[in-house]
């Protein structure tokens, strides 16, 4: 029987810490193009079942792309996912640093879904989605500064910057649309997604770029992947209600905004939301449930290649 091997790699600016599991082999290499190429070749010889890297603000991209282009199964995970996993095992204090051995254990026990990182077009789409999000975050910060500033010169400077940022945001959104329209598969999926009331262009491109598995997984799997599936967090003396945690935070945030719109404009989501409130659910709990329901609907539509059909929904009881 062939024994599976799992690899964790802790990426820093100067070096890469690598851990193999089982076996406990650990070694460190420089974070350079030459050493990355040598590491990829070395790992290829082990035929690992899964390689896990922590997202480190882009530092991980050269390595993750090189591994993917070699055909190796690599996953870039959010640090919070691994930290929650480690705390559940009692292996990590709040301020402890994640290491390669922990990432390897996470790979072996959790086995996160592998994403195709080798497609240059997909990387370009994700990069543009990320950049648009960054511009929006800067705009929010600048608007907050504007509200707190009374000096005329400073206000004028902030307003000019906001005008520039709005132009950049518009340009990025146009570039995203061009990319989607140039790819028949993305365009087909986008048309299906946009047929759903409450699903706009931002959620559409976010799902295409950051949740390419949509339509290929079960409802439970896709909900867990995004982080809207209710999960038990009981451990030792820690007992409580089920909650949602982990998953792809950027997708979840965008889905939250879409659910806010859908609870007013989508008859299915609106009726579902009112029914949960009538059952005594808190508004936040009901909204998270709406996020999950909307995601499940979108997953089913892409899997069956079926556009949205407006159902006859009875008016919720008041």
Give residue ranges: language-model regions.
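Phosphate- and other anionic-substrate recognition elements at nucleic-acid/protein interfaces
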Residues: 1-167, 263-264, 285
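A residue-level signal for conserved active-site and pocket-lining positions in enzyme catalytic cores
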Residues: 103, 135, 255, 280, ...
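Helix-hairpin-helix/helix-loop-helix acidic hairpins
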Residues: 146-202, 211, 266
């Amino acid at each position: 029987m062939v024994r599976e091997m799992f690899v964790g790699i802790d990426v820093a600016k100067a070096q890469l810490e690598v851990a193999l599991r089982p076996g406990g082999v650990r070694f460190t290499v420089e974070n350079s193009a030459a050493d990355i190429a040598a590491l990829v070749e070395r790992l290829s010889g082990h035929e690992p079942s899964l390689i896990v890297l922590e997202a480190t603000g882009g530092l991980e991209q050269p390595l993750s792309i090189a591994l993917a282009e070699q055909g190796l199964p690599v996953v870039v995970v959010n640090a919070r996912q691994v930290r929650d996993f480690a705390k559940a095992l009692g292996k990590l204090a709040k301020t402890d640093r994640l290491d390669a051995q922990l990432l390897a254990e996470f790979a072996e026990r959790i086995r996160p879904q592998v994403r195709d990182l080798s497609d240059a077009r997909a990387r370009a789409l994700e990069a543009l989605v990320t950049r648009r999000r960054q511009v929006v975050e800067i705009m929010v910060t600048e608007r907050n500064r504007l509200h707190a500033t009374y000096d005329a010169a400073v206000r004028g400077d902030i307003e000019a910057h906001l005008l520039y940022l709005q132009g950049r945001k518009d340009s990025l959104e146009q570039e995203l649309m061009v990319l989607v329209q140039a790819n028949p598969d993305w365009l087909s999926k986008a048309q299906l997604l946009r047929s759903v009331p409450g699903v706009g262009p931002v959620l559409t491109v976010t799902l295409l770029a950051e949740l390419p598995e949509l339509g290929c997984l079960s409802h439970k799997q896709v909900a867990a992947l995004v982080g809207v599936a209710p999960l038990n967090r009981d451990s030792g003396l820690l007992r409580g209600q089920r909650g949602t945690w982990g998953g792809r935070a950027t997708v979840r945030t965008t889905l939250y905004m879409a659910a806010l719109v859908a609870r007013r404009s989508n008859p299915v989501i609106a009726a579902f939301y009112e029914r949960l409130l009538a059952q005594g659910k808190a508004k936040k709990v009901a909204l998270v449930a709406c996020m999950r329901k909307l995601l499940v609907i979108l997953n089913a539509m892409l899997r069956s290649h079926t556009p949205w059909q407006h159902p006859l929904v009875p008016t919720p009881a008041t």
